[in-house]
Amino acid sequence: IRLYELYDYVTLFLIAESNLTLSGKPKSLYLKENWSRFARYHNKIRRVEIDLMNSINKTKDVWYNERTMRDEGIRLALPDSKKDFLLLTSDLDEIPKFHFIQTLASCQLHTPFQSLLLQCDFYYYSFGFRHAPDPYFPGVTVSRFSPNDKIPLNLRESRFHNRPMFSTCFHCSYCFDHLETVRLKIASFSHTELNIPKYHDQKYIIDCFRNGKDLYDRHGVRFRHVNINEIELPRLVQVKRERFMYMLDRSSPNAGFRDV
């Protein structure tokens, strides 16, 4: 979805992956193992592998591992450039909208350039549930660099000092088509305190996804049902609606999961 949305408007996709989760568990190198599926995008992808073993052995702080993943990814993947460039950093599920990037690329940018923080339209489980207390998620950073500039290692952490740009990206959290992927995320991500049996229960997960309930019982967190036909969607989701129906409608008895 991300590659389709941005392919015509970016110079290079820098993608970092590791064979360990942030909590230190073995995982597949998904992009490497499925490389042929993305053949049409190969000429604009630079993939690097991050060795998290030293980081994981060094500390029990899973957030340190997450920072290492981001920082090492930028350090290893960023090519030598002979001219100024814009660097966008984000998680995989934070997708800039193509028309914003198209506009940004056509602009005469001021020097010095004030870094941007793209505020994503924030959805949960599918594009049918909008995060109600916080409809925007502070995700993508946009920074400008010259060839001799040293790239800071805290672009993600310092993003709240950037200029906010609202509704310029998508963030669809837990928009998975397999229930086992939900369980895998719970077992793998940095919030290890949430990895408890209740949140792995199949009936519980399906109920949350079908009815827009918070998976983790967090106080004040709720989701608002929205009309899919009245919102903006990523381009590939628009043209392949049947393929991505789980991102559009979770009301079926299996909540759109292909493995249930």
Mark where each language-model region is:
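Active-site-proximal specificity loops/subdomain of glycosyltransferases
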Residues: 18-89, 98-102, 232-258
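A general structural motif
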Residues: 10, 82-84, 113, 166
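Short, conserved loop/helix-junction motifs that constitute active-site signature segments
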Residues: 6-9, 39-41, 109-110
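Hydrophobic targeting segments
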Residues: 11-15
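A short acidic, amphipathic alpha-helical/loop segment
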Residues: 1-5, 100-103
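Catalytic phosphate/metal-binding cores of nucleic-acid and nucleotide-processing enzymes, i.e., regions
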Residues: 1, 71, 75-77, 81, ...
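C-terminal accessory extensions appended to soluble enzyme cores
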Residues: 164-260
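Conserved catalytic core of nucleotide-sugar-dependent glycosyltransferases
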Residues: 94-200
